[in-house]
């Protein structure tokens, strides 16, 4: 019996996987890179490497967006939308709540709408909002990051107070 059989099978399999990977990267580069970045979403240095590779391939990386983004990196036309799960200190439950709320009630109209809708689920805190602002995930809500950073605390306090008033008023 030959001991070479298992090795030739292994090498053949590895060759096939390499061929399939190269084929996907060539014919579906945007989808391939989005999937590749999603596979290392918890490793910021690897994500940075792949973002650099995307730039070399002329693939644009769009910023994270609470109105368009998903938890993972996603394809947006011929571009890649940055995954919400790649933002530091944003937990999966928060991302799930954002996506589900958006799918159920439509796009978030402004910062107050966003905070009000997610505060009802008791899943949002000030640090999470701050990290979303810093990452640019709220940029499409009609304001600058500087403006958002200066008003989000007042909005959270206002929404919290309204919540307390509605409980007392019942």
Go through each PLM region and give its residues:
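Noncatalytic, beta-rich nucleic-acid-contacting surfaces in large DNA/RNA-processing enzymes
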Residues: 8-170
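Single conserved hydrophobic/aromatic residue that forms the stacking wall/gate
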Residues: 1-9
